[in-house]
Amino acid sequence: LEQNQYVVTQQYTFQAGPVTKRADLVMLINGIPIVLIEAKTPVRSSQSWLDGALQVHDDYERNIPELFVPNAFSIATEGKEFRYGSIRMPVEFWGPWRLEDEAALPSIEEIGNAVNSMLRPNVVLDLLANFTSYATHKGKQRIKIIARYQQYEGTNKVVERVVAGHPKKGLIWHFQGSGKSLLMLFAARKLRLH
């Protein structure tokens, strides 16, 4: 973890053949672009995080796919909401990132907490190594799946309890449709590698 070099750069220019694109922010680990961040202005009510996500999904992913070979995930924000998703993930599946015990805060504080939590080097590397999978969307296109925040938190708590030998090691309760199957996939994978 400490031996890696982490840099976040503004206006990252990437060229693929004749096409050149400029992303707002990119997190590089050892010079490799791992996280792309598209930040829209918070003062224009006509723009939202969705505009940034669509720019990533419909423009960057299609026109400079080489940039997304090492990509762990992308982020879109306009300073009021924060959403993340992985390559080819439809934007309607992009989700927020927040700690489960985090109370709702004013927008800019919530964005700051999400950035400070999700973009810590240990979290980015953990997401990259243990919390990604692949699936086929609508029977055609392969997409990269990345854990939602509750799957990330839940998996790490399950692993922590199993390693510590607590009773009811893997017991966790979630609502229907919350991604329990993926949580178990991530937990099994992480436990196997532990």
Give each language-model segment a name.
Residues 1-194:
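ATP-dependent helicase/translocase motor core
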